[in-house]
Amino acid sequence: MSNPILEMRGITKSYNAGQANAVTVLRGVDLRIAKGEVVALVAPSGAGKSTLLHIAGLLDEADTGQVLIEGEEMRGLSDARRTAIRRSDVGFIYQFHHLLPEFNAAENIILPQLANGVSKAAAAERAAGLLSAVGIASRAAHRPGALSGGEQQRVAFCRALANAPKMLLADEPTGNLDPGTSDQVFDALMNLVRDTGLSALIATHNLALAARMDRQIRLDAGQLSDV
């Protein structure tokens, strides 16, 4: 595999070290994701997949090991540099949408762009295009409370892609939806990912959805293996 967008080498992570309730979550994890590759991370609840995603996305730091994004080592970077990389290069999606309730769908997509220095006009144009791409352009002026669960998650997808990241990290992105809605929303996500050429690491316990991705890996007992 050449030109990885993400490379993790020997990642370990423990909590409460030295205490009676100490737990090791990740044990020497190695992972490479190529540009444009979509990888399914299959793991049961509590296996450490959220921790792995947070370390990959610079929201947390490993105890040992290296994280490289496009070949750049993340350890030792200033907080400002890590934040800049996280904002520009990484998009996050969670099981719950975390949309700002006081803003409408379009505004939830516009705001992260403004924080990244994009003009309001350009941000509004991109928001409209993303909402159209996931089939809910007509819902742009609606606040999250007026949207269905599937619509809320589609807006969350658009927000994650607002700043045109190079890599998408998703933690059970359809886990809070019923099966029928889950399939439709996942289709919308995959279409966005494929159309933009994104690399993606998507955690899911849904084996049918995992099978639709380029590759599957399993996290168990703190270690990764191919499925």
Curated annotation (Swiss-Prot):
PROSITE patterns: ABC_TRANSPORTER_1, ABC_TRANSPORTER_2, LOLD. Keywords: ATP-binding, Cell inner membrane, Cell membrane, Membrane, Nucleotide-binding, Translocase, Transport. ATP binds at residues 43-50. Coiled coil: none annotated. It comes from the Bacteria. GO terms for molecular function: ATP binding; ATP hydrolysis activity; transmembrane transporter activity. Its EC number is 7.6.2.-. It is a peripheral membrane protein. PANTHER family: IMPORT ATP-BINDING PROTEIN, LIPOPROTEIN-RELEASING SYSTEM ATP-BINDING PROTEIN LOLD. Part of the ABC transporter complex LolCDE involved in the translocation of mature outer membrane-directed lipoproteins, from the inner membrane to the periplasmic chaperone, LolA. Responsible for the formation of the LolA-lipoprotein complex in an ATP-dependent manner. This is Lipoprotein-releasing system ATP-binding protein LolD.
